[in-house]
Amino acid sequence: MNIILEILLLLITIIYSYLESLVKFFIPQRRKSVAGEIVLITGAGHGIGRQTTYEFAKRQSILVLWDINKRGVEETAAECRKLGVTAHAYVVDCSNREEIYRSLNQVKKEVGDVTIVVNNAGTVYPADLLSTKDEEITKTFEVNILGHFWITKALLPSMMERNHGHIVTVASVCGHEGIPYLIPYCSSKFAAVGFHRGLTSELQALGKTGIKTSCLCPVFVNTGFTKNPSTRLWPVLETDEVVRSLIDGILTNKKMIFVPSYINIFLRLQKFLPERASAILNRMQNIQFEAVVGHKIKMK
């Protein structure tokens, strides 16, 4: 195609996309049904994973629940069964590739082909870099991003065969902005955002438009992962608020889900700020939580 025509098409697409977004802002979008879908949720024994499981249970999905905590995942499954849905609980270490593949083979035999996966399992070690142990850095990447690769690689073939599925990546605003004393966590979440964007582009290039992708990026969430979090500019979110946005995003096939939604505007504007101004803005946020600094626990 002639380069001038391509540029013209690009401009038309940009204008159309903005107009479409404006219309969607005022007109509620149609939500898809997830009834009967086989949904795998990792980290389902607590926090965002548990609440997300309950929302899928309310919508009559078939649930496959993973967590390293046996008691937590079985409690979640029991609550879902009270809602009249089928829930299968598995104890799985999402940092162990062989265990992931073995468990997925078991799920395929016992339940069927997973059609929606929520890669939610995560871990964090708040500390300055020099106080962070090597094995903690390794574990952070194994759980927060490498597990996404192994799970998605194993599930994609059946999704691609049917051109149907949904892959959800639970990341964080920390995947867009570096935070002191969370270097391994931020790095793993940057990787998770990149995984989502790359996978989205690859599926489009392959013509697999029936496989949807979503990426959740909340600010600090009160799940207990980081102790006593606080910020000056952003709220510390409760789990139910985050999950409402996540479920709404999944049901409307939204690609990037920021919570709160206006954080996206902040991140976009920050890219245009001079480095000094950006540093001042970061200080204004006054992000605090308990972290190990110099091998001592301090508020940072």
Swiss-Prot record:
Outcome following mutation: residue 172 to A: Loss of retinol/retinal dehydrogenase activity
Assigned EC number: 1.1.1.-, 1.1.1.62, 1.1.1.105
Residues at which substrate binds: 172
Gene3D superfamilies: NAD(P)-binding Rossmann-like Domain
Positions of the catalytic residues: 185
Tissue-specificity statement: Highly expressed in the liver. Also detected in ovary, bone marrow, kidney, brain, lung, skeletal muscle, bladder and testis.
SUPFAM superfamilies recorded: NAD(P)-binding Rossmann-fold domains (SSF51735)
GO biological process terms, semicolon-separated: lipid metabolic process; positive regulation of lipid biosynthetic process
Principal EC category: oxidoreductase
Stored Pfam families: adh_short (PF00106)
Superkingdom as given in the UniProt entry: Eukaryota
Keywords: Cytoplasm, Endoplasmic reticulum, Lipid droplet, Lipid metabolism, NAD, Oxidoreductase, Phosphoprotein, Signal
Binding residues for NAD(+): 40-67, 189
A molecular function (GO) term: estradiol 17-beta-dehydrogenase [NAD(P)+] activity
Effect listed in the UniProt record for changing residue 156 to A: Loss of retinol/retinal dehydrogenase activity
Endpoints of the signal sequence: 1-19
GO cellular component: cytosol; endoplasmic reticulum; lipid droplet
Residue list for modification Phosphoserine: 33
Resulting phenotype, residue 101 to A: Decreased retinol/retinal dehydrogenase activity
Effect of residue 97 to A: Decreased retinol/retinal dehydrogenase activity
Reaction it catalyzes: 17beta-estradiol + NAD(+) = estrone + NADH + H(+)
UniProt function note: Plays a pivotal role in hepatic lipid metabolism. In vitro, it catalyzes the oxidation of a variety of lipid substrates, including 17beta-estradiol, retinol, retinal, and leukotriene B4.
Protein name: 17-beta-hydroxysteroid dehydrogenase 13
Taxonomic placement: Eukaryota, Metazoa, Chordata, Craniata, Vertebrata
Gene that encodes the chain: HSD17B13
